[in-house]
């Protein structure tokens, strides 16, 4: 039987190793008193350890109070249990004072939300009817009112459209006049520039016409028409007189 028990133990171990899954413990009251006390001691230490880690890692103020089944007190406080309890009491009083106003605000918010939802539904239905949808719900009078509303809205649309078109036409006309004025101004500037250039090119009445290499008209005229040579008779008479005077002196 021992061998059979050993074989059964190995078989159970092999089955656990094969599955590789850890059995989940059902969360319920432990009937065995000794097992319950052992579990309480282990879980309490683990709970206090987690609370301490939370206070250190997250810089949180943690207070933990546990009573065993026999009424024994166990507690953990990251700072001071009295300080934590005082802080808890003051926070609870603040919450109690704020609860009525918060409830009122929640009631007001609920009523406002309901009213807004109703208005949104009515407006959405009105828009669909103006687009020609869901008209079967309306009677003759409601259809006539809808027709008047559409005609009035269409008139406003046409009026606004006409005004915008006229404004665009006026703007284009102003731009056209500006372009015409700018064109005339440029033409005048071009004409003035041409006149001034022509005046610069024409010589003045008292200025001498300059020909090649700085020669004036007078020098060019003299070069073109040389003066006649002196009279030969006059020069011969002068030579005779000079010869006679020289002969007499000898």
Curated annotation (Swiss-Prot):
Matching CDD domains: MADS_MEF2_like
Additional observations: Plants silencing MADS47 exhibit shortened primary roots, elongated coleoptiles and enhanced lamina joint inclinations. Plants silencing MADS47 display hypersensitivity to exogenous brassinolide in terms of lamina joint inclination and coleoptile elongation.
Tissue: Expressed in roots, shoots and developing panicles. Expressed in mature stems and leaves, flowering panicles, developing seeds, and mature seeds.
Pfam families in the cross-refs: K-box, SRF-TF
Annotated region described as Disordered, given as residue ranges: 1-20, 196-250
Organism from which the protein derives: Oryza sativa subsp. japonica (Rice)
Gene: MADS47
Complex and partners: May interact with MADS18.
GO cellular component, one term: nucleus
Domain MADS-box positions: 20-80
Residue ranges with Basic and acidic residues bias: 11-20
Function, in words: Transcription factor that modulates expressions of multiple genes involved in cell signaling and gene transcription. Plays a negative regulatory role in brassinosteroid signaling.
SMART domains from the UniProt entry: MADS
Taxonomic lineage: Eukaryota, Viridiplantae, Streptophyta, Embryophyta, Tracheophyta
Record InterPro entries: MADS-box/MEF2_TF, MEF2-like_N, TF_Kbox, TF_MADSbox, TF_MADSbox_sf
Induction of its expression: Induced by dark. Down-regulated by treatments with auxin and brassinosteroid.
Gene Ontology MF terms in the entry: DNA-binding transcription factor activity; DNA-binding transcription factor activity, RNA polymerase II-specific; protein dimerization activity; RNA polymerase II cis-regulatory region sequence-specific DNA binding
Localization per Swiss-Prot or TrEMBL: Nucleus
GO BP field: brassinosteroid mediated signaling pathway; positive regulation of transcription by RNA polymerase II; regulation of transcription by RNA polymerase II
K-box domain sequence ranges: 106-198
Biased composition range(s): Polar residues: 214-224
Protein name in UniProt: MADS-box transcription factor 47
Keyword line: DNA-binding, Nucleus, Transcription, Transcription regulation
Biased composition (Gly residues): 1-10
Domain of life: Eukaryota
